[in-house]
Amino acid sequence: MAKAARKKFSTSSDPTGSTVSAEKHLNSVFKFNTNLGQHILKNPLVAQGIVDKAGIKPSDIVLEVGPGTGNLTVRILEQARKVIASEMDPRMAAELTKRVHGTPNQKKLDILLGDFIKTELPYFDVCISNTPYQISSPLVFKLLNQPRPPRVSILMFQREFAMRLLARPGDSLYCRLSANVQMWANVTHIMKVSKNNFRPPPQVESSVVRIEVKVPRPNIDFNEWDGLLRICFVRKNKTIAAGFKSNNILDILEKNYKTFLSTANAAANGDDSMMVDDKSSMTDIVKAKIEQVLTETGFSDKRAAKLDQTDFLKLLYAFHQVGLHFA
């Protein structure tokens, strides 16, 4: 993964004192960039509620994504051993540094300046974020796919996105995101947050969710699981069989099957030799295996919108048994 530019500042602040004055100062200096999702949480009660729900321990390192002017940051600093704030806008990073300069918690804050999605993250125990809406999905998957995922994440999202995280099979909002996240973590709704609690106010309402990773972590390859779900949820209300008829999907599965055969033959024979059928016959083999799996599992006429984790696990296992892989 490419490393984003990384810069550290030493910093912290009075959690109750400078919220209003800091915002007035910022408004006089520059305009918030809503294209970067800069909607600053201005309600101190909501900010404190979010931090309290994280259950921060005095020994915890907390990652905050999109700290903005620091209304959450200063409260986190009061409870955590260290705060790592990931901020893309240099202006915000500078203002946050000023806000906490000279305070007792000054040395507890590091700021990572750059694109969060491209940044290689250090170890952290907890994540808190007033999430820029355009990175909601990448942020969730990046957190869950960390070598050592955070114990808990308290994340603010657009209301509809939050409801997708919580959706169950059969719900109208149930989708690949729902099935994927719920495999790796338990998700609960914490609170609704009105758009009037932000400056400038966004066009939509928000919700805060709590994501706690499952322990032990499911013994499943993340990319294999995600690869299967991508195919099944391309058209979630169509049959599973219909999703596997795409030429692009067949090409991917055929390529992966050839790799599987090559690896299996090399392990058995001590070399890379294998019999490679012509294109048409290999495609027919893959199609036949797909039909076999869907028929034997009984999922051919099922729809992804109605399937739960157990169903998808059965499907993934059956495909692996015939040598078909998704990553």
UniProtKB/Swiss-Prot annotation:
InterPro entries xrefs? KsgA/Erm, rRNA_Ade_Mease_Trfase_CS, rRNA_Ade_methylase_Trfase_N, rRNA_adenine_dimethylase, SAM-dependent_MTases_sf
Catalytic reaction(s) noted? adenosine(1779)/adenosine(1780) in 18S rRNA + 4 S-adenosyl-L-methionine = N(6)-dimethyladenosine(1779)/N(6)-dimethyladenosine(1780) in 18S rRNA + 4 S-adenosyl-L-homocysteine + 4 H(+)
Q: Where is the composition biased (Polar residues)?
A: 10-20
Sequence segments annotated as region (Disordered) = 1-20
Picking any one GO biological process from the record gives: maturation of SSU-rRNA from tricistronic rRNA transcript (SSU-rRNA, 5.8S rRNA, LSU-rRNA)
| Function per UniProt | Specifically dimethylates two adjacent adenosines in the loop of a conserved hairpin near the 3'-end of 18S rRNA in the 40S particle.
Q: What protein name applies here?
A: Dimethyladenosine transferase
